[in-house]
């Protein structure tokens, strides 16, 4: 089965561009990460932005300019090749999706590795909770919101959130479990009425895919590592690269290493 791929085999398939799908449900137990890659002149401001917004942008590590490797997350990880799909922005505008960064890499680029909510999915599943998008074989639903980030330097904007539906009973358990994973966005930022956080139509996510919400379920929203992409569109750095929403870097680190409590 596809989702039974070992981490090594999955990474090989990603690096060879054989695997280009969303990574939710893959490599259970391993920390998945968002990427933001910026010119060094913009890196200090973005580092401050992460420090001021740890729920939306939980910083795992950051590289030196030009470095494509980060031993703290994996000895063999190549940040320019080991994501299923990258998004390229110029002046804050989305320009292209690319399978790797071989032709785009520059010596002044600084890579920020940010935690992802996919990392706590195994803990939810092991506790007996079902995750709708994984069960349906879909990417997670993600939405722009009216929740403001704390501005820092050149960077400002609003949260993006991911959504998973649960019954009220299961939602309480999900809150308890995910609180243990602050480096994967931690506890939800909202549950219930989507309009309170500026979502007008829950059936039309801004990123990812829609999932069905049963009549006895409520939507539960976590901060999402697509937030920087929203901020980039507003802050307009001259050049930026990110992961494609839902298509993450899978590290060698276990999610449990970053758990608390």
From Swiss-Prot:
Offer an example of a GO molecular function term for this protein.
lyase activity
Q: Which UniProt keywords apply?
A: Lyase
Q: Origin, by domain of life?
A: Bacteria
| InterPro entries with a match to the protein in the record | D-Glu_cyclase, Putative_hydro-lyase, UPF0317
EC number(s) on file: 4.2.1.-
NCBIfam families referenced in this protein's UniProt entry, alphabetically: PRK05463.1
What family is reported?
Belongs to the D-glutamate cyclase family.
This protein is called Putative hydro-lyase VSAL_I1435
Organism of derivation: Aliivibrio salmonicida (strain LFI1238) (Vibrio salmonicida (strain LFI1238))
